[in-house]
């Protein structure tokens, strides 16, 4: 067709540009860059400014450890989880083709977790049996007294969720840890700089110690404020409340780290835009951003059952404790017992606020703030190839929104707080209606 057109002086028809998927586009770009490299070698041109995508090779484990600042900064929290038997992850030896973080049911950490869990479960069962027995044999069968017992018994049941909600997802948690390790090294190879997490090391140590200090303070406050709360009951609640605090700390640390990584990526991208031939590097930045977005989703996938079940417990406990305190004030006025219940409500709402608020800030920093910096780039000052790469990065952000969710069950953001508060208000009204109905029946009798 082309020969026929040329021989007759006609213009051949234009070709229709094919539609390529992301993998085909990446392959085509790599081929074009490889040809450009061969041409530069043939011309004797310096290759320092040339860019060719690095092939997927097995990274040196010692280099991974060298650039794994996040693991070193948060190691104290990982060790605390191992000591408490919450998440028995292991750090594999530096061997090629072996992930740096792993999970094994036959490891020393897993055996220790089972041993600690057996002791803790024994104490929980003893306290649970004592509380149920005391409630059954108590002459006071009021609805309010049943509510008080439900609060503390429901907290004890969270202990039995640990093997199902936490240990079962150990391999997914190990994948998430390895994603952080690989991401930092990939960031270094792409940008030439490392991700710096300022004050994260100190913050993690403070959160680890504060988790247990807060647990002891809350349980002792219940011992002094609740008349039927014996001192030996607290030994069953210490590790449960501390575990809740540790999971809240883990969520806070990771959300903070996501924001730091996003800020480092945007700074490196802006520095590249101001340099020569930025289009050749922007593709790698796009892949780095997509990896960061997937890592945020992996956090919710790895801990979906644990955080989901604890959110339900927090929601349930907040409603019951709020009703118990309001009901007791209506009947007998303000006493120390109501103060103890308000402490529980305040703790649960603070836990829920931190959980949702930090996820909101992480999603905004990785998504909206990063997108805003891209939109502020003066595209008239760059070449056409760079403009296309910036557009592709904006498309990647819109197609892969950095939304933190619990494996698709629920999106974690500020809207979840308002939804829970509205549900709490609804259920409180229903419970107070039961209260008023019970009072009317007693007055009639």
Where are these regions (language model features)?
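Short, non-transmembrane cytosolic segments of multipass membrane proteins
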Residues: 46-75, 152-168, 256-273, 374-375
């Amino acid at each position: 067709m082309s020969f026929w057109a040329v021989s007759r002086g006609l213009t051949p028809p234009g070709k229709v540009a094919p539609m390529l998927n992301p993998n085909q586009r990446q392959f085509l770009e790599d081929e074009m860059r490889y040809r450009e490299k061969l041409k530069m070698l043939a011309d004797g041109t310096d290759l320092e400014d040339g860019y060719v995508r690095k092939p997927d090779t097995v990274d040196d484990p010692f280099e991974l450890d060298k650039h794994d600042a996040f693991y070193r900064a948060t190691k104290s929290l990982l060790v605390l989880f191992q000591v408490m038997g919450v998440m028995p992850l292991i750090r594999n030896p530096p061997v090629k083709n072996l992930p740096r973080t792993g999970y094994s049911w036959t490891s020393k950490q897993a055996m220790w977790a089972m041993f600690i869990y057996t002791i803790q479960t024994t104490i929980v069962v003893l306290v649970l049996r004592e509380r149920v027995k005391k409630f059954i044999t108590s002459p006071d069968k009021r609805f309010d007294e049943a509510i008080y017992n439900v609060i503390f018994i429901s907290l004890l049941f969270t202990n039995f969720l640990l093997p199902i909600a936490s240990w079962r997802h150990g391999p997914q948690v190990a994948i998430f840890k390895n994603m952080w390790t690989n991401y930092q090294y990939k960031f270094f190879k792409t940008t030439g700089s490392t991700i710096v997490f300022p004050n994260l090391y100190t913050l993690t140590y403070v959160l680890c110690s504060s988790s247990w200090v807060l647990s002891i303070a809350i349980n002792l406050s219940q011992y002094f404020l609740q008349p039927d709360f014996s001192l030996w009951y607290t030994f069953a609640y210490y590790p449960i409340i501390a575990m809740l605090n540790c999971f809240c700390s883990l969520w806070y640390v990771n959300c903070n780290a996501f924001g730091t990584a996003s800020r480092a990526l945007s700074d490196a991208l802006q520095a590249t835009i101001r340099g020569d031939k930025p289009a050749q590097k922007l593709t790698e930045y796009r892949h780095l951003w997509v990896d960061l977005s997937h890592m945020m989703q992996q956090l919710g996938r790895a801990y979906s059952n644990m955080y989901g079940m604890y959110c339900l417990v927090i929601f349930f406990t907040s409603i019951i404790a709020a009703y118990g305190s309001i009901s007791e004030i209506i009947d007998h006025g303000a006493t120390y017992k109501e103060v103890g219940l308000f402490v529980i409500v305040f703790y649960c709402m603070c836990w829920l606020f931190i959980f949702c608020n930090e996820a909101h800030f992480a999603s905004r920093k990785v998504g909206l703030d990063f997108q805003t910096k891209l939109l502020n780039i003066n595209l008239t000052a760059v070449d056409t190839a760079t403009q296309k790469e910036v557009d592709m990065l904006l498309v990647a952000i819109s197609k892969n929104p950095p939304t933190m969710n619990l494996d698709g069950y629920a999106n974690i953001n500020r809207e979840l707080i308002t939804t829970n508060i509205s549900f709490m208000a609804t259920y409180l009204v229903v419970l107070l209606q039961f209260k008023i109905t019970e009072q009317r029946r007693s007055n009639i009798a």
